[in-house]
Swiss-Prot record:
Keyword Secreted: yes
Role according to the record: Insulin decreases blood glucose concentration. May have evolved to activate insulin receptors (INSR) in vertebrates. Molecular docking studies reveals unique interaction with the human insulin receptor. In vivo, insulin-like peptide injection reduces blood glucose levels in two models of zebrafish diabetes (streptozotocin- and glucose-induced). Also shorter swimming distance of zebrafish larvae, an effect which is not observed with human insulin.
Name this polypeptide is given: Insulin-like peptide 01
Entry-linked SMART domains: IlGF
Entry keywords, A to Z: Carbohydrate metabolism, Disulfide bond, Glucose metabolism, Hormone, Secreted, Signal
Organism the protein comes from: Exaiptasia diaphana
Signal peptide (UniProt feature, chain positions): 1-24
Length: 121
């Protein structure tokens, strides 16, 4: 690989990285965060919120408790504790084995109300 091609490739990778950082920062303020869907029919889905710590339990109880269900809008309003992705990563520790659970769904990747309801009995 000649030096011009190598320099072009490095420049391209740096610009690509910077572009992804610019567009990923503060996505909640620009109308919503998105993540890859587990559903093969939809490529992208909007994230309702990032929640960590005690807020996960409170949200789980609100979504899974028997009786009248809260509407999504009411649940988001009650959750005034929504945080950005960088802040939510502080709550997680590295694990040797990859385990997907409600903490990883909602704290690290962000989740929607329907994903929380998947953890109900």
């Amino acid at each position: 690989m000649d030096s011009f091609t190598r320099a072009s490739l490095i420049t391209f990778l740096i610009l690509l990285t910077l572009t992804s950082l610019v567009f990923s920062n503060g996505c909640m303020m620009r109308g919503g965060c998105f993540k890859t869907s587990e559903d093969a029919h939809r490529l992208i889905m909007q994230v309702d919120f990032y929640i960590c710590g005690n807020a996960i339990f409170d949200t789980f109880m609100d979504v899974c408790r028997p009786g009248p269900r809260r509407r999504k809008r009411d649940l988001r309003r009650k959750l005034g504790i929504v945080m950005d992705r960088k802040e939510s990563h502080k709550f997680l520790r590295r694990r040797k084995r990859r385990v997907y659970d409600i903490v990883e769904e909602c704290c690290m990747e962000g989740c929607i109300v329907e994903e929380v309801s998947e953890y109900c009995d």
